[in-house]
């Protein structure tokens, strides 16, 4: 619940009336439900059929499949969010084209991405849970994101850390390695990653 509130603060950073919000990769709809309760006009896209059905029941609205992104009209949304989704996209060029198209003027695209230059990524190496092989098709850094969007009309406004992610990813990494006390060790590594990121700027997720 805390993480959902933090996500909403990032996505809706200023007071807007009747915000039209699209969450791509919405899962079972928890973030969209919170946004709906806050007065947003919500739309979701989810590739997993089971998760999509749960979200539709929870939100009482139709959740789109990824293929339906191309059918969304131009200038449809004030905000588009992708929480750990872009790294799963096979065709980045086409995806970004549609993101530009469906955003309104002065609209915002919010991306959350695992950062493979973070301390926890370097610590766990190939066991880092956020690599999520083979589902993660792209491993992106702050530099690569800037380069990808350099050729678009979208402008990078700000980069903010998702500080809770370092703990979650570190605990998962410990579990993948079948280590004892994975919860405690993950918390310690997540804390150390955040501490180092305060100097380096390389947070576990951005």
Give, region by region, the residue ranges found by the protein language model.
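Short glycine/proline- and charge-enriched loop/turn segments
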Residues: 124-133, 173-179
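Hydrophobic anchor at the start of a short beta-strand
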Residues: 42, 156-157
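Short helical patches
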Residues: 1-4, 12, 118, 184-187, ...
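Conserved SAM-binding loop
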Residues: 3-127, 137-151, 162-164, 205-206
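A C-terminal cap/extension of S-adenosyl-L-methionine-dependent methyltransferases
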Residues: 158-206
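Residue-level signal for beta-strand positions within conserved beta-sheet cores that form or flank
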Residues: 59, 133, 155
């Amino acid at each position: 619940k805390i993480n959902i509130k933090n996500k909403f603060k990032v996505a809706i950073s200023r007071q807007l009336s009747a915000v039209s919000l699209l969450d791509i990769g919405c899962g079972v709809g928890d973030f969209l439900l919170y946004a709906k309760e806050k007065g947003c006009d919500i739309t979701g896209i989810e590739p997993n059929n089971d998760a999509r059905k749960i979200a539709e029941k929870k939100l009482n609205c139709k959740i789109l499949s990824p293929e339906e992104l191309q059918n969304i009209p131009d200038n449809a949304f004030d905000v588009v969010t992708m929480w750990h989704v872009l790294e799963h996209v096979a065709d980045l060029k086409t995806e970004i084209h549609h993101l530009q198209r469906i955003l309104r003027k002065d609209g915002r695209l919010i991306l959350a991405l695992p950062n493979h230059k973070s301390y926890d990524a370097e610590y766990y190496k190939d066991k880092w849970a956020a690599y999520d092989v083979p589902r993660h098709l792209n491993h992106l850094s702050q530099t690569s994101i800037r380069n990808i969007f350099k050729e678009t009309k979208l402008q990078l406004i700000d980069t903010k850390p998702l500080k809770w992610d370092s703990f979650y990813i570190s605990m998962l990494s410990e579990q993948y390695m079948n280590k004892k006390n994975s919860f405690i060790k993950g918390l310690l590594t997540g804390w150390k990653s955040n501490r180092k990121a305060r100097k380096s700027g390389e947070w576990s997720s951005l």
